[in-house]
Amino acid sequence: MAAAQRRPLRFGWLSPCIGNRWSDHKPIVVEQAKYILPTVNDHFDSMWVADHFWGFDAKTDPFVEAWTSLTWLAAKFPDVQLCHHVLGQGYRPPALTAKMAATLQVFSENRFMLGIGAGWRGDEYTAYGYEFPSPSVRYAQLEEVVTICRLMWTEDDPSF
């Protein structure tokens, strides 16, 4: 590929949303945003936040909520793209997801990109009282969420 056709390499930062005993059980993202990210801010094009209810080692690990975290990061770092890594479609009703995404897009001045998936952590679904359907049903639900989001973002009077 010719140099003129190449896109510049871009870097994203995946937020460590979990806390641990070394962080005094506070989410590590808070410390990194305070001390580390300001010194390297010019080197990252995007920031990504995972959408889970708890960590992978124990349900008692502190884990920050993804939408609130991205909104906080949008306010602290006004020059980077923002995305979930990856939003679980089954955790929220589709119309609410579309509204939350549209709101963050406005507040961030068009720096938000909706990263969404079918969901895979059955333990999180059941712990919060959500149904955890088969993969084929979750993929069909994902398709519906994307359709509903697009309709709500582009139509004056959407219907599904």
Enumerate the predicted regions with their spans:
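N-terminal beta1-alpha1-beta2 module of alpha/beta enzyme domains
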Residues: 1-76
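Hydrophobic faces of well-ordered beta-strands that scaffold small-molecule active sites
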Residues: 11-15, 47-49, 81-84, 112-116
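Alpha-helix-loop-beta-strand connector modules within alpha/beta enzyme cores
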Residues: 60-84, 141-152
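Internal, glycine-rich beta/alpha segment that forms the wall or movable "lid"
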Residues: 2-7, 93-160
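Residue-level signal for the nucleotide or nucleotide-sugar donor/cofactor binding architecture
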Residues: 61-64, 91-92, 137
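Active-site beta-loop-alpha junctions enriched in small/polar residues
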Residues: 16-18, 52, 87-89, 117-119
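Short linear capping/connector segments at secondary-structure termini
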Residues: 50-55, 85-88, 129
